[in-house]
């Protein structure tokens, strides 16, 4: 939950939003707001949702890390999210490599981590948790590698287009404004 270009936004994974135009966003203590999907990049796997104020959350300033090269390797990272059945968790790790248009990290992740915001120690936003790596054992058996987390980098976005889409988006004021808003999965269970 951030303030970007004078608006409140939630940034998540594009595969969470799919092709929806509005989403229900959960705060804490039962609070729910509805946001308009302002920008989606399925190739990078990032979506921006413009939301009204979430009273049970504190918005941080959107400060994107625009670097995307091997100088990121070794950078200490933190992400916060609602993986699996857990409430808010904070996980730390570091950048291992830059590969296939993503930032590959060494930090714990599991199903339900997708969309969690990833920040460096200076508070710059690197992107979102996009997925965990999958390795193969003999006979084609695939297993999740929970310590290798793929981050969709915000540095690969068209920042001017993101700004235009955020500024021109409608901010829904009530949950009833969009009665069919789909809620993203939270805590590994459908809302």
Regions found by a protein language model. Give the residues of each.
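Flexible, gly/ser-rich surface segments that form the specificity/activation loops bordering the active-site cleft
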Residues: 57-113, 129-143
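Short beta-strand segments
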Residues: 31-33, 58, 91, 150
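Catalytic-histidine neighborhood of serine endopeptidases
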Residues: 3-54, 72-73, 131-132
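Acidic surface patches and DE-rich sequence motifs
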Residues: 27, 83, 120
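Residue "hotspots" at secondary-structure boundaries inside conserved domains
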Residues: 15, 68-70, 117
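C-terminal cap/linker of serine protease catalytic domains
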Residues: 56-58, 125, 129-191
């Amino acid at each position: 939950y951030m303030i970007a270009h004078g608006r409140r936004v939630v940034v998540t994974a594009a595969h969470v939003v799919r092709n929806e135009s509005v989403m229900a966003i959960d705060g804490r203590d039962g609070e729910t707001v509805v946001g308009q999907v302002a920008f989606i990049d399925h190739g990078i796997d990032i979506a921006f949702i413009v939301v009204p104020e979430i009273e049970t959350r504190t918005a941080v300033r959107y400060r994107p890390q625009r670097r995307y090269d091997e100088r990121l390797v070794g950078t200490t990272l933190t992400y916060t999210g609602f993986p699996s059945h857990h409430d808010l968790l904070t996980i730390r790790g570091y950048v291992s490599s830059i590969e296939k248009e993503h930032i590959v990290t060494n930090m714990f992740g599991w199903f339900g981590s997708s969309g969690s915001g990833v920040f460096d120690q200076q508070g710059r936003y690197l992107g979102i948790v996009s997925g965990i790596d999958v390795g193969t054992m003999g006979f084609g058996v695939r297993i999740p590698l929970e310590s290798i987390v793929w981050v969709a980098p915000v540095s690969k976005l068209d920042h001017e287009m993101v700004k235009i889409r955020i500024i021109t988006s409608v901010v829904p004021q009530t949950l009833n404004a969009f009665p069919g808003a789909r809620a993203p999965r939270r805590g590994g269970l459908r809302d």
